[in-house]
Amino acid sequence: MCGIWALFGSDDCLSVQCLSAMKIAHRGPDAFRFENVNGYTNCCFGFHRLAVVDQLFGMQPIRVKKYPYLWLCYNGEIYNHKKLQHHFEFEYQTKVDGEIILHLYDKGGIEQTVCMLDGVFAFILLDTANKKVFLGRDTYGVRPLFKAMTEDGFLAVCSEAKGLVNLKHSMTPFLKVEPFLPGHYEVLDLKPNGKVASVEMVKHHHCRDEPLHALYDGVEKLFPGFEIETVKSNLRILFDNAVKKRLMTDRRIGCLLSGGLDSSLVAATLLKQLKEAQVQYPLQTFAIGMEDSPDLLAARKVANHIGSEHHEVLFNSEEGIQVLDEVIFSLETYDITTVRASVGMYLISKYIRKNTDSVVIFSGEGSDELTQGYIYFHKAPSPEKAEEESERLLRELYLFDVLRADRTTAAHGLELRVPFLDHRFSSYYLSLPPDMRVPKNGIEKHLLRETFEDSNLIPKEILWRPKEAFSDGITSVKNSWFRILQDYIEHQVDDAAMASAAQKFPINTPKTKEGYYYRQIFENHYPGRADWLPHYWMPRWTNATDPSARTLTHYKAAAKA
């Protein structure tokens, strides 16, 4: 995890513009570099480094002697870089995984390059010989990327929007900033004056398609067919490999552990892989909650079962409320469920950075979208409709769960790794018949649970534990985080404000006082940027007016039991 920033065709003093690059310093606490592009006085790169691989020669922009005309600034991890290096016999100058991008580009161009990358990435590649600029982002947008471009060809790119909003440009007093679409790359012409012109935007990978790099990843051969035992075996192989490839780091590895199915499977598989790799330190797992939190109890059971060095972080309602402003600033969104769920993750990331030496943190993000884990999937009218909804959620991950996971950890200089969003694992899961993936017997993620039924990876009671939303599970069933927030915000936003909400906030007008409160904070930090969020996250096929899972029938029944 790092922070990347670049300008092309700036008409303002670069030393002044560079101040904006410091807005993302949290993403790379180990080092910073600002570098002008030779021959283009109005083009530059900024890079904040979190040293995870090749601590000696890993600074960016990456430049190697063989390609003096190529400049690369990227944020990500390319897990198959060594396999590709050996297969194509590339001569590396560094040990940095991102160097593979330069070699692949020289060999086969930009399209082949992005299709070959197994990992998560956001990059800016400059080719001064052919006068081209390329931008690219991974399939699910696990690594963030924002851009701003004016009609006269000024281009600004950054890992987070906050690094662009204060940039100055003579032609545009208000610079439009927007997220770069996941799963795409863009080709731009570089003009002699340093300005650019967009040539094409290309989708390089759909989540359902088996990626091109599968030809080179070395995973043992999968069994053909959709018999249940065959499918379960293939899923175990792919998930095991998804975790194993993500061990690539020179820093200590830890794991978030909520005690839910997803994080528990990740933690248990991770610990097994660390032992096989003969890593000499114990795996640290981390859980957060208030007193009587069901997550804390469940996480403790999993940690005892797998034998991790477990850390429990307690917080109270006041501490959670106090960080709402910081959280919304970090997130760059006012989406209600994203803000709620981010408080716990923000606080536990802060604890990890301050109290441990774990830097690379594994987590279970992406599973709910991929495996139809949300409670409302029980209401899907058909397996085909459930499949459509699952793919929609995956396409929008970069706006919600992936955004939350990246910003809350990056705010504290941590790097997050998400095995459930592995290309091979996710594309195989999505290739399965729709009726195999839906909830069964009143239990969501039935296929995933059944896959690990006989593995003894995690306790049976955890394997079959019902879905618990992170923002709800960190508090007690009787007094959820949802209810705590409502009680507090009721006194912060009056009825008169709600009555005029549509006039004040015409885009995504808040319908609740909680939504209004978050929107006010967002507008204080990012005025006029409401269009970053196309719509609020809400469950489908239900008349719920709030995204909290606790408001759904499934939970109301559980609370009374």
Curated annotation (Swiss-Prot):
Residues flagged as site, Important for beta-aspartyl-AMP intermediate formation: 365
In-chain residues carrying the UniProt-annotated modification N6-acetyllysine: 385
UniProt domain Asparagine synthetase: residue ranges: 213-536
GO CC terms in record: cytosol
InterPro entries: Asn_synth_AEB, Asn_synthase, Asn_Synthetase, AsnB_N, GATase_2_dom, Ntn_hydrolases_N, Rossmann-like_a/b/a_fold
The reaction(s) this protein catalyses: L-aspartate + L-glutamine + ATP + H2O = L-asparagine + L-glutamate + AMP + diphosphate + H(+)
Example of a GO biological process term: asparagine biosynthetic process
EC number: 6.3.5.4
Positions of the catalytic residues: 2
PANTHER family for this protein: ASPARAGINE SYNTHETASE, ASPARAGINE SYNTHETASE [GLUTAMINE-HYDROLYZING]
Name the record gives this protein: Asparagine synthetase [glutamine-hydrolyzing]
Organism annotation: Bos taurus
Gene: ASNS
